[in-house]
């Protein structure tokens, strides 16, 4: 015997079964948990890829320090969360928590560097990093999870 399509309701009256598309159901779930990882990969996955953008399809942010050696950027979530979430950053290269794979261009040394969560609200996360020198540019490759569980 196989059972599918359960619907639980409060009260004594049963209503018609509510059908939702995959996209609608996913959007409702993302109010509680969201990840940038491709489907089928868990948080912190080690792609062990010199060029992580080929395999893991990470978030890529360009940072430029103008008058200081630190900078910050706001990154929006796919859907608004039910509460301010706990955000964890992972390197797109090897899954190291709290770091991003940093491409520093010609003459620079590519490596994992810290990418810090400065502030979270229901709509976005503010991320910050140190670039090491004024006017130095870098690209940060990372994944994230955002948890706003009950």
Where are the predicted features?
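Extracellular polysaccharide-targeting segments
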Residues: 1-42, 149
């Amino acid at each position: 015997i196989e059972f599918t399509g359960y619907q639980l309701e409060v009260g004594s009256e049963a209503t018609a079964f509510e059908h939702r598309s995959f996209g609608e159901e996913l959007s409702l779930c993302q109010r509680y948990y969201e990840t940038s990882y491709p489907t089928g990969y868990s948080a912190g996955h080690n792609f062990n890829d010199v060029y992580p953008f080929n395999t893991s399809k990470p978030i890529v942010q360009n940072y430029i320090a103008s008058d200081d050696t630190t900078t910050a950027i706001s990154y929006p979530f796919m859907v608004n969360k039910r509460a301010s979430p706990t955000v964890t950053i992972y390197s797109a290269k090897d899954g190291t928590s709290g770091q991003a794979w940093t491409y520093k261009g010609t003459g620079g040394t590519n490596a994992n560097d810290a990418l810090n969560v400065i502030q979270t609200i229901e709509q976005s996360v503010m991320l910050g990093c140190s670039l090491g020198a004024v006017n130095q540019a870098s690209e940060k490759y990372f994944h994230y999870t955002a948890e706003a569980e009950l």
